């Protein structure tokens, strides 16, 4: 019986590769089941706002289930990159780009998503209540067509938001017009973008609500903006969400240099070099 079973996986036997693939998929599935965990939340219990949010929402019911082919961080990254490229090819998203000139000569911008089925990009002030505005601050890549940004964009658009992706210096074919590139401390650039949108597209009667969302590096920049501006930020945005905020830049840098044979930092470095050459 044992010999018969082993013969099924003998190199050159019928459907050998199919059998190997089947075993691989089964093993991956078993690992994802093993890695499935209930989310745990660690927060200051004296924070009444967070305590109320935890109590009223269903966020504590969320369960982390790894994707079948993403049983490790590296596999997750590779699967994500493949999915992102497929999304760009088969379901590309178009944008209405608006550029903003900064006081020091630098250039930032906003990629406004078109409303579904229309060519309506940038918001328009109206005499009646209009769509709430949601500005997205992406991560290290800084592009508006990253899959994690696009997925949120589409979900928010279905919920009735006008979506714009903030583009910091040097991002996604923006012209480099000063001697400064974007970095984790670029909160003043974030401030300039938010105040530009507030002044240009939000009426003085505040018929439109305006929110900001930051992911990874974008979350770090947005958080620093709110810390530095304090209550003044509340006059510009009506709310903000930070996701995947890097709490230690030095540890994050070590991760890029030391993990996956340095592939992460090489990829980012190549992309940055290409952007500068353009």
Question: Which residues does each predicted region cover?
Answer:
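Terminal signal-anchor or tail-anchor transmembrane helices
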Residues: 2-38
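Alpha/beta-hydrolase-fold enzymes
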Residues: 27-52, 199-278
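N-terminal topogenic membrane-targeting module
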Residues: 36-74
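N-terminal cap/lid segment of alpha/beta-hydrolase-fold proteins
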Residues: 73-127
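Intrinsic disorder
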Residues: 94, 104, 128-131, 143-147, ...
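Core residues of folded domains in eukaryotic genome-function proteins
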Residues: 96, 104-108, 130-133, 159-164, ...
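Short, surface-exposed "cap/lid" segments of acyl-processing enzymes
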Residues: 113-177, 196
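Catalytic nucleophile-loop/oxyanion-hole region of alpha/beta-hydrolase
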Residues: 146, 169-211
């Amino acid at each position: 019986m044992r010999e018969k079973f082993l013969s099924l996986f003998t190199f050159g036997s019928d459907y050998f590769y199919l059998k190997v693939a089947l075993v691989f998929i089964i093993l991956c599935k078993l690992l994802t089941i093993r890695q499935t965990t209930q989310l745990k939340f660690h927060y200051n219990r004296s924070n009444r706002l967070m305590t109320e949010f935890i109590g009223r929402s269903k966020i504590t019911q969320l369960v982390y289930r790894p994707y079948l082919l993403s049983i490790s961080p590296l596999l997750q990254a590779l699967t994500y990159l493949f999915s992102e490229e497929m999304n760009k090819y088969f379901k590309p998203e178009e944008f209405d780009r608006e550029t903003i000139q900064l006081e020091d000569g630098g250039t930032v911008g906003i990629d406004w998503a078109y409303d579904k089925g229309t060519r309506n990009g940038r918001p328009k002030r109206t005499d009646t209540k209009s769509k709430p505005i949601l500005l997205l601050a992406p991560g290290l890549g800084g592009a508006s067509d990253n899959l994690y940004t696009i997925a949120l964009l589409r979900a928010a658009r279905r919920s009735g938001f006008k979506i714009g992706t903030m583009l910091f210096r040097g991002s996604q074919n923006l012209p480099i017009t000063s001697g400064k590139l974007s970095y984790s401390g670029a909160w003043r650039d974030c401030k300039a973008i938010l105040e530009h949108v507030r002044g240009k597209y939000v009426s003085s009667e505040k018929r439109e609500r305006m929110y900001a969302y930051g992911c990874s590096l974008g979350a770090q920049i947005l958080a620093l903006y709110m810390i530095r501006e304090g209550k003044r930020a509340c006059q510009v945005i009506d709310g903000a969400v930070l996701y995947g905020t890097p709490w230690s830049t030095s540890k994050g840098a070590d991760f890029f240099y030391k993990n996956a044979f340095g592939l992460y930092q090489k990829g980012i470095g190549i992309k940055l070099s290409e952007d500068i050459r353009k």
